[in-house]
Structure formats: structure tokens, C-alpha cells
Amino acid sequence: MIAPEALKALLMNNQVIPVKFAGHRMLLDAGGVLLWPQQDLLIFSDLHLEKGSFLSQFANPLPRFDSKETLKRMHLMMQRYDCGHIVCLGDSLHDGNALSRMQIDDLERLNTLVDSVAKWTWILGNHDPDIPPEILGKRAPLLQIQNVLLVHEPEVLAIVNENAINENCALDSQHVPVEAQIIGHYHPKSSYKLANRKVTGKSFVCGDNILLMPAFGKYTGGLDINDKAFEHMFTRKSALVYLTYHQKIYLL
């Protein structure tokens, strides 16, 4: 885990902002990751590895180096926080054939990252409902940690809790109700007028019981937080938006 002195420096430099979500203290990093110190957990979302090679098949003039860059940035974030558990919130691969296009050294680099921590969980997404066995790590459709659900797309929590209660009754065990969820999928971005210019960046969005992660992948765009797609999750007035820009993070 990151040393207190190093964390203090990040906080003073506006690279990290502390938040309280679902009763837990967490840290949002300008690099697009979430740290849950109490759980020794670092969360990434929407890596979209091999998106460049996918698009280049359709005459899009994009270089095929996005996976290298994404993995390099992942390594830096992992070195920064030194957590024992990594969770990737779905769409880690851009498509079902991503592995066939991935360069051998990139696959080796990915597996080296996975093998460097005690636990690595791939949450499955709509782009990667199956992750090939050549990639190390555990697969799961969702993951509950205490009262928080980690999942790619938002779930109806009442249904999640009902299903869990039924399963736990069969096992004669006690269920901790899910009260909030951390999700990916939407690639939220926001904008802010600064002097004579407007800055736009990937963003975290924190509502009452839902926290949206920004996309981490190199070639991942964003959906403006004012888009109607977000209306069923939160209202703009009720949500806290954290804009990332040039390795800084700001509460709007």
C-alpha cells in the first residue's frame, strides 16, 4: 500500500481527491483509477485493449499501440498504490477476437501484471463476455465487497439482494445487503470553462448510491454527463462530478 507521505504529496498536488461513498473512504486518482484503502483494492475500468487494431481493420488510420500504452499506464498506477487486489470493471478487451490480434509481448506484459498481485478480478462486460484462458486472473459477472457491488453495467439492487438472500438461505449464511454500486460502461466525461477556454476530460461521477468510473483505455472516448443516458442513474444537481485533466483532478 502507498506510503502516507507519498499519498499526502498526491493530495497536495491535486492528483488525488478523497471521497466517501456508501460509508467507505475511497480515493479518486487523476489517472482514472479508484483506490479503496480499507480493502487494499485498486479499480480500473474499460481498458478496451486492442481497440486500435480492431478499428484499423476498417480503414481507420490508427496506430496499433494503444494496448502498450494502456498497459504501461496500468503498471504506473499499480506501482503507485501497491495494492494486493486489482479489479477491472469490464470491457477490458475491445472485442471477442482481441487476443488474436494482441502482440505476444503485450500478452506477456499483461500476464506479468496479473501475476504480480495476490488477486486479480476481471468483471465481464458487454464487449468481453468471455475472457480467453490465455489471460490470467479470475473472471466474474460482478463482485460484492461489503455493501458495494462492483459491476460493468448498473444492476437493480433489489433484485441483486433478493437473489443473494435466496442463495445464502440455501447455504445457511448471512447476506450483507448491497446498498451501492461502482460501475463502468458509460465512459463519462465533463467540461469546464476556464478563463477563455473550455477544458474537457474523463470524469468520475458520484451519486447517492452509484459511482461511475471513467474509461482507462488509451482509445476510449467519452459520453457527456449531461446526456440523457445518465438520467435514470442520477440528476446533475444531485451528483458530484470529478474532472480529470492533465494529471490533475477537480471537483466541479
What is each residue range found by the language model?
Residues M1-L89, H94-L252:
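Extended recognition/assembly regions associated with phosphoester-bond processing machinery
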